[in-house]
Amino acid sequence: MAAGTTSDLRNGIVIRYNNDLYQVVEFQHVAPGNWRAFVRMKLKSLTTGKVIEDRVRAGAEIDIVRIERRPMQYLYREGDSFVFMDNDTFDQIPVSAELVGDAVKFMKENETVDLVYDAEKDQIIGVELPIFVNLKVVETTVAVRGDTATNVTKPATLETGAVIEVPAFINEGDVLKIDTRTGEYITRV
């Protein structure tokens, strides 16, 4: 655990705050007139996925957690856990569904993802997907002809079970590039 101050805050770093691990989603230094400066933070809990907003005095001490990302291959789901394989040692590591979170929507078997570890405790704190993944459309509705006055979208079910909005010209069997951060369609591959 590295001690730091609010001047060390950056988007994406992990801090220990109120006895939980949070990833900094957004922060803003505010100096209102003749009042004391403070830092407004938007934090995402790595254990629950809940996003909170809080503010702390500028210059306050914060605990920065050193994290480590290890590439692992997602093998299969077993009950309430997901099994990953270390690409170097070939050890199989079960990870609970709570730690996997929303990443499950875009995880395909045999794909490589990063397991995020708390480096001090050597404990898994989450799963990080690549920014873009290619997934196949397994089910979608047929577009209505003539309904093209605006950007028409329709729901499409991907091979992982996720449902996203896609343009009307997408058909079953198409492979799409998806942004895993937002869950949005990028392009057809």
Swiss-Prot record:
It comes from the Bacteria. Pathway: Protein biosynthesis; polypeptide chain elongation. Keywords: Cytoplasm, Elongation factor, Protein biosynthesis. GO terms for molecular function: translation elongation factor activity. CDD domains: S1_EF-P_repeat_1, S1_EF-P_repeat_2. GO terms for biological process: peptide biosynthetic process. It is found in: Cytoplasm. Pfam families: EFP (PF01132), EFP_N (PF08207), Elong-fact-P_C (PF09285). InterPro entries: Elong-fact-P_C (IPR015365), NA-bd_OB-fold (IPR012340), Rib_uL2_dom2 (IPR014722), Transl_elong_fac_P/YeiP (IPR020599), Transl_elong_KOW-like (IPR013185), Transl_elong_P/YeiP_cen (IPR001059), Transl_elong_P/YeiP_CS (IPR013852), Transl_elongation_fac_P (IPR011768). GO terms for cellular component: cytoplasm. Belongs to the elongation factor P family. Involved in peptide bond synthesis. Stimulates efficient translation and peptide-bond synthesis on native or reconstituted 70S ribosomes in vitro. Probably functions indirectly by altering the affinity of the ribosome for aminoacyl-tRNA, thus increasing their reactivity as acceptors for peptidyl transferase. This is Elongation factor P. It comes from Chloroflexus aggregans (strain MD-66 / DSM 9485).
